[in-house]
Regions:
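Fe-S-dependent hydro-lyases/dehydratases of central metabolism
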Residues: 1-889
């Protein structure tokens, strides 16, 4: 941290904590000296205000920006652009590897300009947690964990060696090795400080812990009162190199919670309820801040579960204020007493402690006593289904999806059972959303214990797995003696990582796959994850339901989505009595008592004392020690990215977009999973052909996520999700389009190759909430490499819009209820963005011209979704990293 040299509001003060002196930028002093009323700001905006006070330099941050936070109070909204500098950056390996590759390529570009390549170095703390690569290859066996770790290192040795090179090559760059946990849970339990301490010119400074992360669920840490959200890897890389995050001061929605959850409900039920409420409200691009007397009834883990799913309810973050529960968690998770004292004193001094005297843009309220057991599905987190309605809801889903009157039934070869539409084939306790919450994990363990003791078993067609986000989870399950019962039901430990939640569910048995394909069975997964988009969990699963860990276990026993868990028996005991869910569901008191006896601070301290060592396989990996990476031309995992090749000294400026062909016309809620899938690679695809050329067998394909260090793979995989539906190619599903004027259906990548030969510009047409989901920068990088110049949609999700600009792609938004349907777009049109080459400004009205095949011409006004002046500079430079690099050389 290097504070700005200005101090317009005379806010730099000193505080004494435990007889130690610290400097800090006082919000109280700033209020006295010109920022009247700011004590009533939402706590999250106070964090932004402190950041501006600390970095005021009259260049990137000036007095007007600071004053604009005060002005926000007048209308509770603002169009002012501010420059925000988070304290640190959090990466995971799927996004971290391309980030390190970009930094390595930038070093080469600097060297080629005869400058010092070591100027490319992170200026803020960067932590990369390797959690996305482990797959559920083995499950339901005592040695599943060991086998999966071995396979993980066999597949990813080259990638991990590259990351080890990055750790020694770059400053301020730490790696948490594989097999440790999920980045957000490690962040919550270990990395976060709530209040950051840093030395500058001999003085120690205190300031709020803040971060951005290259994973959309970075928001989880807001449950610990650490302001953070997901950004694309390209924006994170720019932030590492000192570029502030350009943002508009957000609206803040106050979410009041009252009362407490009733007996028999979980934090998962609560968060799925919150997701539905806030999606209906509409909070995209806004902060949500929780307050109210109900906060005292939410544990820190409950808050983290709610904060985790901010991307699912559309908000930039879901922030919780500092209070006694925050301090309790810090102590409980092994933080030292002085750290806890700093947090308490600083929060109370700065007005960051929980209070009720807050002015919000708007408010919404939830009486938590009304929460009931809930699941969400079949394909969106906001598709809330009350557990009581689950069987009838699924029947309706099945009827709409298949038009079948009767179930497809398929015999599974070499077994004595059959599967049918609605059979649950995957049941996974997975994801940081829930495995960070001891109450629901203990709940699942107690339910398993009762089920086993009563003689219940999981159905044989269900693939079961347990993948916690932290090693502490297995410690307390073992101490409670519950791991034995989970193991007996097939929920053996398979790894510490994201696994099924991100699509790394591993293969289903061949005889199960054959049975699905033989009768086109509409198969189901149930997982304790945060996303259930189409095609995400497994290529063979059509419907995915999110549920609490105890319900995941219950559904694995039930085996079918049409089982009514309230009315239908799950099985019989030894005396032939029916057993129902209510007979095995643990009480809140049972959970609390077990938790008190099995979880303590020493577990956190011990597990994180040697967090950087990693397993023996990690320790054995060798890497070169150098500042410039030696690229292996034959590698199919890590290639030098092309984004900085032949970089001109001057910005590219505004480029003409004329007579562009639509490459895809897409509907609503197209996710970044649709645009750039993370999971399975199909043999019959352009990527499969590429692998065939490089003599790579299907068993060694790994996943798209693991190949993000290779642009050749990723550009072929862009828009290759098996469930994407391009309206230009009706009757197809997957990565296909129709090329014009021939009207020939081709794979997306093959069509791009053909259009490139012709010198044809390309655009993508979208519906509402284009780019929702993961903060996947490859969804923008791949779009760029395909030659797409603009994306024209009805609305954009926050992170993807930013990523498009960060790659030099123009986002345009339809206005006045105009859309692809009432424009009658089919893909045969030629589209021009008029006068863009003459220059545009943020939020300009931009006219597009549509030439129809009939000869008709229509002009349509759109909104330029370049929102800030900084974003405009990024666009003119062809991307944010190109902008940063030009400024450095």
């Amino acid at each position: 941290m290097t504070p700005g040299k200005k101090n317009s509001y005379n806010s730099l003060k000193t505080i004494l904590i435990d007889n130690k002196e610290y400097k800090y930028y006082s919000l109280k002093e700033a209020e006295k000296n010109g920022l009247e009323g700011t004590s009533n700001l939402p706590k999250s905006l106070k964090v932004l205000l402190e950041n501006l006070l600390r970095y005021e330099d009259d260049l990137s941050v000036n007095k007007n920006q600071i004053n604009s936070i005060k002005e926000w109070l007048k209308s509770k909204k603002s169009n002012t652009e501010i420059a925000y500098r988070p304290a640190r950056v959090l990466l995971q390996d799927y996004t971290g590897i391309p980030a390190v590759a970009d930094l390595a390529a930038m070093r080469e570009a600097v060297k080629d300009k005869n400058k010092d390549p070591n100027t490319i170095n992170p200026l803020s703390a960067v932590d990369l947690v390797i959690d996305h690569s482990v797959q559920v290859d083995q499950s339901a066996k005592s040695d599943s964990f060991e086998k999966n770790v071995d396979i993980e290192f066999e597949r990813n040795g080259e990638r991990y060696s590259f990351l080890k090179w990055g750790q020694q090559a770059f400053n301020n760059f730490r790696i948490v090795p594989p097999g440790t946990g999920i980045c957000h849970q490690v962040n919550l339990e270990y990395l976060s400080k709530v209040v950051w301490t840093e030395e500058f010119q001999g003085d120690k400074y205190l300031f709020p812990d803040t971060l951005v992360g290259t994973d959309s669920h970075t928001t989880m840490v807001n449950g610990l009162s650490v302001l953070g959200w997901g950004v694309g890897g390209i924006e994170a890389e720019a932030g590492m190199l000192g570029q502030p995050i350009s943002m508009l001061i957000p609206e803040v929605i106050g979410f009041e919670v009252t009362n407490k959850m009733p007996e028999g409900t979980t934090a998962t039920d609560l968060v799925l309820t919150v997701v539905k409420i806030l999606r209906d409200k509409g909070v995209v691009g806004k902060f949500v801040e929780f307050y109210g007397e109900g906060l005292k009834n939410l544990t820190l883990a409950d808050r983290a579960t709610i904060a985790n799913m901010a991307p699912e309810y559309g908000a930039t973050c879901g922030f919780f204020p500092i209070d006694d529960e925050t301090l309790k968690y810090l102590k409980f998770s092994g933080r030292d007493q002085h750290t806890v004292d700093i947090v308490e004193h600083y929060a109370k001094e700065q007005g960051l402690w929980a209070s009720e005297d807050i002015e919000f843009t708007d408010t919404i309220s939830l009486d938590m006593s009304t929460v009931v057991p809930t699941i969400s599905g079949p394909k969106r987190p906001q598709d809330k289904v009350l557990l009581t309605d689950a069987p009838t809801s699924f029947k309706k889903v099945l009827e709409e999806a298949t038009n079948k009157k009767d179930h497809s039934i398929s015999k599974v070869s070499n077994t004595d059972y059959e599967i049918k539409d609605g059979s649950i084939l995957i049941a996974a306790i997975t994801s940081c959303t829930n495995t960070s919450n001891p109450n629901v994990l203990i709940g699942a363990g107690l339910l398993a214990k009762k089920a086993v003791e009563l003689g219940l078993e999981v159905k044989p067609w269900v693939k079961t797995s347990l993948a916690p986000g932290s090693q502490v989870v297995t410690d307390y399950l073992e101490k409670a003696g519950l791991n034995t019962y989970l193991d007996k039901l097939g929920f053996n430990l398979v790894g510490y990582g994201c696994t099924t939640c991100i699509g790394n569910s591993g293969p289903l048995p061949e005889n199960i796959i054959d049975a699905i394909q033989k009768e086109n069975v509409y198969a189901v997964s149930v997982l304790s994850g945060n996303r259930n988009f189409e095609g995400r969990i497994s290529p063979h699963i059509k419907a995915n339901y999110l549920a609490s860990p105890p319900l995941v276990v219950a559904y694995a026993i039930a085996g079918h989505m049409e089982v009514d868990l309230y009315k239908d028996a799950l099985g019989k005991d030894k005396d032939d009595n029916d057993i129902y869910l209510k007979d095995i569901w643990p009480s809140n008191k049972e959970i609390e008592d077990t938790l008190k006896q099995s979880l303590n601070a020493e577990m956190f301290i011990e597990r994180y004392s040697n967090v950087s060592e990693g397993p023996s396989q990690w320790q054995k990996i060798q890497t070169e020690k150098s500042s410039i990476y030696s690229w292996d031309e034959g590698s199919t995992y890590v290639k030098k990215p092309p984004f900085f090749d032949n970089l001109s000294d001057e910005p590219e400026g505004f480029k003409e977009i004329k007579d562009a062909r639509p490459l895809l016309i897409l509907g609503d809620m197209v996710t970044t999973d649709h645009i750039s899938p993370a999971g399975n690679i199909q043999k019959e695809s352009p990527t499969g052909e590429y692998f065939m050329e490089h003599q790579i067998l299907p068993k060694d394909y790994n996943s798209y996520g693991s190949r993000r260090g290779n642009h050749e793979v990723m550009m072929r995989g862009t828009f290759a999700n098996i469930r994407i539906r391009n309206e230009m190619a009706p009757g197809t599903e997957g990565g296909f389009t129709k090329i014009y004027p021939e009207e020939k259906v081709l794979p997306i990548y093959n069509a791009v190759v053909e259009y490139k030969k012709r010198g044809t510009d390309l655009v993508v047409i979208g519906g509402k909430e284009y780019g929702t989901g993961s903060s996947r920068d490859w969804a923008a990088k791949g779009t760029k490499l395909l030659g797409i110049k603009a994306v024209i949609a009805e609305s954009f999700e926050r992170i993807h819009r930013s990523n498009l600009i960060g790659m030099g792609i123009l986002p345009l938004q339809f206005t006045n209820d105009v859309n692809r349907k009432n424009l009658n777009l089919i893909g045969s049109e030629l589209i021009s963005v008029l006068d863009v080459e003459k220059g545009i400004n943020p939020s300009d009205e931009v006219t597009i011209e549509i030439k129809y095949a009939s000869g008709d011409i229509k002009k349509v006004k759109t909104l330029c979704r370049i929102d800030t002046k900084n974003e405009l500079e990024y666009y003119k430079n062809g991307g944010i990293l190109q902008y940063v690099l030009r400024n450095m050389i």
